[in-house]
């Protein structure tokens, strides 16, 4: 049905509902009309329909319907780039959804708002919009995780997450948060593959391909785009496939393969475009590519016998590339032109012009120093022409300025340019040079700017004696004749040609290329460089592979990226094909070409989770020690795969991964001494094997220049082909708008099992299912006339088969869909989907491959290019590609019930035919057993694939407990008090959903180092070498220290888990790390297993009040702190809000003797909120001997409250350094005096350093000393207002006591010498140790001390220090 027919039908239904007064039905019609119009780009008309829908729903007071209408209006406004109005409606949608407490619509609303903010960023490059988009997507994701889990089907939740992950990936890519971007894209692709979400998979792969392309990673880009193209073919969305072909052509142009780019563009043209401007862009790009191809062919002809013609062609190519902003290729063309010109001994003037072109191009590439070199060469060749010398000197100055050279290098260039312009009497040029020099001087040398300004004024007043002549040379020479219409080969009749004629046309075209050698039939390749054997291996056609090899097809040809057929078979998990290829001599350790980063078939298989294939490769001698260019061995590749997908793996897959890891470790130990020499014997410096390769690699040698951003600086004015203007503009950061969630997916997912996560190289969309999952294939080989027989054969073929469940032939359809029989005459559009047999011998280039790119297993590295343009476009909105979903929303949920009557356009109609249902193997319902281990309850599925015993169940439960808690228990199981025998089969003693109790009989506790390694592996965390050394050296010590390592939470978790049940540990020091609040629970779990711990140092660990609260609340009723005697929480941002938690902590530490709370951010308001609780806790701390509150700005009032609460009879050591709130806080000493004069005060050491104390404060303190005879140590250092007067007062007071002080510190006080003899007598009689540090002490003081000290005393007399101690 055409668009007009659908519109006419819906309009009639709308009019009928209007006549009958059925407002709801009329609103439904408006909704459908709006959707249909928007899908064809008629946004204004669609907006009017949705506005009418809103009015109708408001009149019937349908709140949910109004909310959806606001969302649709917002989407249409966003598509029309009226973002402020769009956000207004979307926030109304959010408010209405909130008023209904509808979490489904709330999730949609936040996702829609985030998408619009992302559009705003594309429009105006506002970072604030990006941050708002990120926040909105995260809120939407939080609703999915916290509110919708269990409310919707798993498929709907997966589709929501898929789209949100994609949008978050795009947002992080714009924010240049590369690691997060990669993780989000991986999750999106994995979920889309797992749940057969082909439209979302297309978007993720397309956008990831665009990111790889912008990052210069062409190999990954091609594979992602090919995967996206497969999705488009599977959905029969020609416009989407056209977009992929368009972007593929851009990648191929970057690689220098313009013939392949031409074929991709022709396919894009034949497939058609949704919007007229896209079709125009394709045509113009094709004109540009055709021009390049023709010039390159002419250059091949001319290079051998016509150097003059070759030189002219190089100039035309350079001009063409320059106009296309492809400056590296333009530079190469101009360099070749210069080479030919020098061979021909062309005149200096011609050489100067070439140097100028090179300099201009290098400037566009930001390589300014090389540009200066060519400008200098031009200057040498143009000697004597004052005007040209002036322009060249001016260009040199501009280039040096862009390079950031110093003013001393810039000024002479502009001055020489000005002098030459004066000689040429060109006043306009003089003014231009002086004006620029004046600007430079204002920025770099302001004192010289005044003279230049005066010269400018004088020059402006001078009358020009002659008019300026336009000396700009006409550089727009026609590089070639206008393109003939026949050369375009784009007549509409091509659309009607059958596939055979198209293939012959391509072959004729390629055979007609000049300079092509005749190639054999096995070297016929498609756009990706794939041979017949490549395609058969990708598609899992074992019989086809066998036939090709028997007919003599080479075993090891490479595609354009460097992959061999064995790589492809391993990548897609086709076990039997791998076995066959190995039997016939395929290179088992081939590292791939330049674009493959040294990935061997074994790496490929492990990176996709194909363990059976990996096992076969190892058995056949694959090296387990070869490393990729990223330095990854096969074992490390497997560990990365497990780390990435661990949470999504089922138990069986985890067990297979663990088994494979052990296998690799064993094989590594055996191969370590004799690695396979295959790496040296396989040529990896060419893209193809010698037996089938063209003369050189199709991928050009990468230039040293970094890939230019798509938003390049304006091209030079040199143009030879006017029609290529828009074709050569590099596409900017294109994104496909995620589809709306207005309807649930109607794909039949009955047969969708959670698949093993495979990090494919993203060329063809392959879905790997479980071995027994039926696969109704749609390939031509399996299509037969009977629908029932086809479905049956497909199901039987899938049972126990290792064939790939490829995405495209396995596209899910409804259970009542009949496979359409294939006719002998293949329609043209279907031929496109399989068009690949093209004789493709690329143009002669450097033998080097494309630029090194990231490993396919690490395709996440995609550095975003800088943007210089504000406006960014999208290639096409998905609105027009699929009417099932709409733009501007990032999730999928069920449509509200009020709108459920709306018909959805989902593609081909599904007919009811029971015969079309595939025959499924019926499995009994699964057995799930609940196992209780201490406080943890685990639900463990028991697979039917084998009979498992109770011992197996105990092992599974122990592994789950280890994954959760970090400890591996040995268990016995009981059911209703009865002990279960380990050898009994589970079905004989348990039923589904039974709960059994697990008793821990013992713990598996290997050496500390091994426990740490096992915890790191379990958590997917890399080992920290310093922690590993600490574990090894301190394993038998009662003390463990990992201080000052700055370990983050992820690194601390395996450390803490390894320390669990380390019962011999008495001291744990973790100072100087980044524990933080989130890790407090993990710390508490560890402390609960250390009953003998007496010292805990958590200082400087970013622990806040929330973390302290978690420690306290979790320890209630436990023994975590029962024996702790010393606790250090210093330098943690606890703040005043921790008072309640601190009080509780004191109560949970009944034997605490030392508490250090230095620099915890306590302020004068400390003790106010929970004074009673905290005061009571301190008073009850009867064992507390040492308390440090130093470096907290408490002030006198707060200090008074603290001291009132402290026990007087037990506290011996009190540190109060730098607790004054201000310098004028003179009353600080008063609460201290009150404490010291309390009855029974037992304080022995008091620190009051750095509190701005004066002699008056010391005098007051001295008066109370006779009342506190227990005080024997006093620290008054760093109080510069304390002088000799204060010292004398204190010494006099000490004479009234039975004993003096064992320690007295006055370092940093204003003690001025020389001290009199009486004072020295008091010092030596009352003090056992004194520390003085003052610049005012004299030599006489030092001499006096040395003379008076008794025998055996120690002294330190150096600089301003004067210390002594009587032993």
Swiss-Prot record:
Domain of life where this protein originates: Eukaryota
Keyword Repeat included in the entry's annotation: yes
Protein's organism: Rattus norvegicus (Rat)
Keyword entries, A-Z: ANK repeat, Chromatin regulator, Chromosome, Cytoplasm, DNA damage, DNA repair, Leucine-rich repeat, Methylation, Nucleus, Repeat, TPR repeat
Residue numbers carrying Omega-N-methylarginine: 797
Ranges of Acidic residues composition bias in the record: 465-509
Function: Component of the MMS22L-TONSL complex, a complex that promotes homologous recombination-mediated repair of double-strand breaks (DSBs) at stalled or collapsed replication forks. The MMS22L-TONSL complex is required to maintain genome integrity during DNA replication. It mediates the assembly of RAD51 filaments on single-stranded DNA (ssDNA): the MMS22L-TONSL complex is recruited to DSBs following histone replacement by histone chaperones and eviction of the replication protein A complex (RPA/RP-A) from DSBs.
Composition bias type Polar residues, residue spans: 666-684, 894-909
Region (Disordered): 460-509, 660-714, 726-785, 798-820, 841-910
Notes concerning its domains: The ANK repeats mediate the interaction with the MCM complex and histones, while the LRR repeats mediate the interaction with MMS22L.
SMART domains: ANK, LRR_CC, LRR_RI, TPR
UniProt GO MF annotations: histone binding; histone reader activity
Biased composition (Basic and acidic residues): 772-781
First and last residues of every ANK repeat: 528-557, 561-590, 597-626
Compositional bias (Pro residues): 692-713
Name the UniProt record assigns to this protein: Tonsoku-like protein
Chief location: nucleus
TPR repeats by residue range: 27-60, 67-100, 107-147, 162-195, 202-235, 242-275, 311-344, 352-385, 390-424
Subcellular location: Nucleus; Chromosome; Cytoplasm
Annotated Low complexity bias: 844-857
Oligomeric and partner information: Component of the MMS22L-TONSL complex, a complex at least composed of MMS22L and TONSL/NFKBIL2. Interacts with the MCM complex, the FACT complex and the RPA complex. Interacts with MCM5; the interaction is direct. Binds histones, with a strong preference for histone H3.1 (histones H3.1 and H3-4/H3.1t). Interacts (via ANK repeats) with histone H4; specifically binds histone H4 lacking methylation at 'Lys-20' (H4K20me0). May interact with DNAJC9; the interaction seems to be histone-dependent.
Family recorded in the similarity comment: Belongs to the Tonsoku family.
GO cellular component terms attached to this protein's record: cytoplasm; DNA replication factor A complex; FACT complex; MCM complex; nuclear body; nuclear replication fork; site of double-strand break
One of the protein's GO biological processes: protein localization to chromatin
Residue windows of the LRR repeats: 1062-1086, 1090-1118, 1121-1144, 1181-1205, 1240-1263, 1268-1293, 1324-1347
């Amino acid at each position: 049905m055409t668009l007009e027919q659908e519109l006419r039908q819906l309009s009639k239904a709308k009019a009928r509902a209007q006549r009958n007064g059925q407002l709801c039905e009329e609103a439904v019609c408006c909704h459908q009309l709006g959707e249909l119009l928007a899908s064809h780009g008629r946004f204004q008309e669609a907006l009017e329909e949705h506005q009418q829908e809103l009015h109708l729903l408001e009149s019937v007071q349908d709140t949910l319907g109004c909310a959806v209408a606001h969302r649709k209006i917002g989407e249409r406004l966003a598509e029309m780039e009226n973002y402020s109005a769009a956000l207004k409606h979307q926030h109304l949608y959010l408010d209405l959804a909130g008023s209904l407490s509808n979490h489904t619509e709330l999730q949609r609303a936040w996702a829609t708002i985030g998408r619009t903010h992302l559009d705003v960023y594309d429009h105006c490059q506002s970072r604030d919009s990006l941050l708002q988009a990120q926040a909105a997507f995260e809120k939407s994701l939080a609703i999915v995780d916290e509110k919708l889990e269990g409310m919707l089907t798993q498929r709907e939740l997966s589709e929501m997450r898929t789209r949100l992950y994609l949008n978050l990936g795009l947002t992080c890519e714009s924010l240049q948060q590369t690691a997060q971007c990669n993780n989000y894209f991986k999750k999106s692709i994995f979920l889309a593959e797992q749940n057969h979400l082909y439209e979302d998979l297309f978007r993720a792969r397309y956008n990831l391909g665009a990111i790889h392309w912008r990052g210069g990673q062409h190999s990954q880009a091609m594979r992602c785009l090919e995967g996206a193209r497969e999705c488009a073919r599977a959905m029969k969305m020609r416009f989407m496939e056209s977009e992929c072909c368009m972007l593929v052509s851009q990648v191929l142009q970057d690689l220098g393969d313009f013939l392949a780019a031409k074929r991709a563009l022709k396919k894009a043209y034949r497939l058609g475009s949704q919007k007229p401007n896209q079709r125009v862009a394709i045509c113009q790009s094709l004109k540009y590519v055709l021009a390049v191809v023709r010039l390159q062919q002419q250059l091949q002809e001319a290079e051998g016998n016509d150097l003059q013609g070759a030189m002219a062609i190089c100039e035309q190519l350079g001009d063409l590339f320059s106009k296309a902003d492809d400056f590296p290729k333009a530079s190469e063309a101009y360099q070749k032109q210069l080479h030919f010109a020098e061979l021909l001994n062309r005149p200096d003037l011609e050489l100067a012009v070439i140097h100028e072109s090179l300099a201009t191009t290098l400037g566009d590439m930001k390589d300014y120093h090389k540009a200066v070199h060519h400008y200098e060469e031009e200057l040498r060749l143009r000697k004597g022409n004052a005007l040209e010398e002036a322009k060249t000197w001016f260009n040199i100055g501009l280039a040096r300025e862009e390079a950031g050279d110093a003013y001393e290098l810039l000024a002479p260039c502009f001055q020489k340019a000005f002098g030459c312009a004066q000689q040429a009497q060109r006043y306009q040029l003089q003014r231009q040079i002086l004006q620029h020099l004046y600007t430079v001087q204002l920025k770099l040398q302001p004192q010289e700017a005044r003279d230049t300004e005066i010269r400018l004024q004088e020059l402006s007043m001078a009358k020009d004696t002659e008019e300026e002549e336009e000396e700009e040379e006409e550089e727009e020479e026609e590089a070639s004749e206008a393109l003939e219409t026949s050369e375009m080969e784009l007549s509409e009749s091509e659309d009607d040609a059958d596939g055979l004629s198209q293939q012959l046309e391509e072959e004729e075209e390629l055979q007609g290329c000049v300079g092509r050698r005749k190639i054999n039939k096995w070297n016929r390749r498609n756009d990706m460089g794939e041979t017949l054997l490549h395609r058969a291996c990708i598609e899992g056609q074992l019989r086809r592979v066998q036939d090709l090899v028997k007919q003599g097809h080479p075993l090891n040809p490479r595609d354009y990226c460097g992959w061999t057929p064995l790589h492809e078979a391993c990548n897609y998990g086709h076990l039997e094909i791998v076995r066959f290829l190995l039997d016939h001599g395929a290179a088992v350790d081939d590292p791939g070409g330049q674009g493959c980063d040294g990935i061997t078939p074994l790496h490929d298989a492990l990176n996709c989770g194909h363990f059976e294939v990996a096992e076969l490769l190892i058995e056949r001698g694959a090296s387990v020690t070869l490393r990729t260019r990223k330095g990854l061995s096969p074992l490390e590749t497997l560990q990365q795969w497990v780390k990435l997908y661990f949470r999504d793996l089922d138990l069986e897959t985890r067990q297979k991964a663990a088994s494979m890891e052990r296998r690799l470790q064993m094989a590594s130990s055996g191969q370590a001494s004799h690695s396979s020499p295959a790496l040296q014997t396989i040529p990896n410096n060419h893209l193809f094997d010698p037996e089938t390769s063209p003369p050189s690699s199709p991928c050009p040698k990468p230039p040293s220049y970094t890939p230019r951003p798509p938003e390049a600086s304006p091209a030079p004015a040199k143009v030879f082909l006017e029609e290529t203007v828009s074709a050569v503009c590099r596409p900017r950061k294109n994104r496909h708008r995620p589809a709306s969630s207005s309807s649930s997916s109607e794909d039949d997912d009955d047969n969708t099992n959670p698949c093993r996560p495979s990090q494919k190289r993203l060329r063809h969309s392959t879905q790997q299912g479980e071995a027994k999952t039926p696969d109704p294939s749609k390939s031509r080989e399996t299509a037969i006339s009977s629908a029932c027989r086809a479905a049956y054969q497909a199901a039987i073929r899938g049972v126990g088969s290792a064939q790939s469940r490829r995405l495209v032939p396995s596209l899910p359809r409804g259970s009542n869909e009949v496979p359409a029989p294939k006719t002998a005459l293949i329609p043209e559009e279907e031929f496109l989907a399989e068009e690949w047999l093209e004789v493709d011998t690329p143009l002669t280039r450097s033998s080097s491959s494309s630029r090194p790119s990231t490993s396919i297993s690490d395709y996440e590295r995609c550095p975003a290019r800088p943007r210089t343009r504000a406006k960014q476009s999208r290639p096409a909105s998905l609105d027009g590609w699929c009417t099932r979903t709409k733009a501007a929303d990032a999730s999928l949920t069920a449509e509200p019930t009020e709108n459920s009557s709306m018909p959805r356009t989902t593609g081909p109609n599904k007919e009811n035919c029971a015969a079309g249902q595939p025959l499924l193997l019926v499995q009994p319902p699964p057995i799930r057993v609940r196992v209780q281990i201490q406080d943890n309850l685990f639900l463990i599925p028991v697979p039917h694939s084998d009979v498992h015993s109770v011992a197996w169940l105990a092992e599974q439960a122990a592994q789950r407990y280890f994954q959760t808690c970090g400890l591996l228990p040995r268990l016995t199981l009981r059911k209703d008090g009865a002990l279960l025998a380990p050898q009994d089969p589970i079905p004989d003693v348990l039923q589904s959903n039974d709960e059994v109790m697990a008793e821990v009989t013992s713990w598996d506790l290997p050496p500390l180092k091994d426990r740490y390694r096992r915890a790191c592996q379990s958590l997917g965390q890399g080992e920290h070498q310093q922690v590993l050394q600490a574990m090894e050296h301190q394993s038998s010590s009662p003390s463990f220290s990992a201080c000052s390592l700055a370990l983050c939470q992820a690194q601390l978790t395996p450390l803490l888990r390894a320390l669990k049940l380390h019962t011999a540990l008495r001291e744990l020091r973790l100072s100087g790390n980044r524990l933080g609040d989130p890790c407090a629970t993990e710390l508490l779990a560890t402390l609960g297993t250390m009953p003998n711990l007496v010292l805990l140092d958590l200082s400087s660990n970013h622990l806040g009040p929330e973390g302290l609260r978690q420690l306290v609340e979790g320890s209630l009723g436990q023994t975590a702190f029962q024996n702790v005697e010393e606790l250090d929480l210093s330098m943690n941002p606890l703040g005043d809000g921790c008072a309640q938690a601190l009080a509780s902590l004191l109560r949970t530490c009944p034997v605490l003797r030392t508490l250090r709370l230095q620099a915890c951010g306590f302020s004068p308001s400390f003790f106010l909120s929970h004074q009673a609780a905290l005061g009571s806790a301190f008073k009850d701390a009867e064992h507390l001997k040492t308390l440090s509150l130093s470096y907290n700005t408490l002030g006198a009032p707060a200090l008074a409250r603290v001291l009132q609460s402290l026990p007087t009879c037990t506290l011996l050591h009190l540190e109060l350094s730098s607790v004054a709130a201000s310098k004028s806080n003179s009353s600080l000493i008063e609460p201290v005096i009150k404490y010291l004069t309390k009855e029974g005060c037992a304080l022995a050491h008091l620190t009051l350093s750095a509190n701005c104390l004066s002699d008056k404060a010391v005098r007051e303190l001295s008066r109370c000393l006779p009342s506190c005879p227990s005080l024997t140590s006093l620290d008054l250092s760093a109080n510069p207002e304390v002088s000799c007067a204060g010292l004398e007062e204190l010494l006099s007071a000490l004479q009234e006591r039975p004993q003096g002080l064992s320690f007295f510190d006055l370092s940093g006080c204003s003690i001025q010498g020389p001290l009199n003899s009486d004072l020295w007598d008091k010092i030596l009689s009352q003090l056992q140790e004194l520390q003085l540090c003052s610049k005012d002490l004299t030599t006489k003081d030092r001499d006096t001390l040395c003379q008076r000290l008794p025998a055996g005393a120690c002294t330190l007399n150096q600089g301003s220090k004067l210390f002594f101690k009587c032993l």
